[in-house]
Amino acid sequence: MGNLDWNLALELAEEHSVLGVVAARLKETGYGGIPADAWEKLQSSMRTQHLFSLSMTAELFRILDAFGQASIETLLVKGPIVSFLAYGDPAVRSYVDLDLLVRDAAILPACRILTALGFEADVPESAILAGKIPGEYLFKRAGAQQLVELHTEKTFRYYPRPMRIEDLYARKRRMPLEGRDVPALCLEDELVLNCIHGAKHFWERLMWPADIAAIVARHPEIAWERVRQAARDVGAEQMLHVGLMLGESLLGVAVPAEMAASANTDGAARELVRQVEGWLPTAGYVPPALLQRAMFRLKMGGGGLAGTSYLVRLSLSPTEEDWAEGKEERGSRVWEAIKRPFRLMRKYGQDG
């Protein structure tokens, strides 16, 4: 590694949100070969990441306590849970927010609790009362870098078919996190959710395939028939295959034997993997153009009628970005749906 440009390597790792993973692997080798200036830069970044993780964990416990007192069931997804599952440490994987899943019926009291805890709501209560569904219910703490996102079965619109939230709650488990057990999805459901989440973001950063590969490698106990059924229930078989194939092609983690037969015969998934490999080096800085995005969504949704239905629904389902300013509670949903494709054309219409 004598000719390696360490500053560039660390910069790329940061852009792909895998700096913590790189640091953990270098630690295993005793940081052999890394120059002093690069080592100091890496250690500084890791200290910052660990302090952030600790502050977010403390905030999480406050929220869970408040939700518990109000009898609001919630599940922690992504973020520190994925870091623990994939790397054995909630602080290894970088994340910017806490993601909590609650039932749609509980979203109003859950939002009010976060407001009472000092968070500022990005989605006004008037919009919730009007029945509008954002992409997520985002909360920010003024003067801090703490973000919380509430999700429901209705905001997870990137599921090809509706999320079966009661099934997820029925299979939930408690996981250790910094000395305390927290409510989480079962291992198989978390894996499927993260494949869907990676597909949502076009797998633009190495972080998402790395998570899938690490979870598969660390957990031989995964019940693959349960994974397959969970993906089938929500129409996400293609997304699951792509996630597993990316783990194999990019990280060298073989597609599990239990999944190999279906994955290896999935030509559409292999084509999608090649597409991802083409744009992955840019780490999302050169996003796919509009038509490329549309075709990717169509194929990721299963192709044919199912994929077309998935693409049309995503194209015509307004989020908070489509709501008219000051009319969050009154805007015509039909008009918002009509405007959405034009907004997407303006945002992604230019090639690259």
Where are these regions (language model features)?
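Conserved NTP-donor binding/palm subdomain of two-metal-ion nucleotidyltransferases/polymerases, i.e.
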Residues: 1-96, 102-352
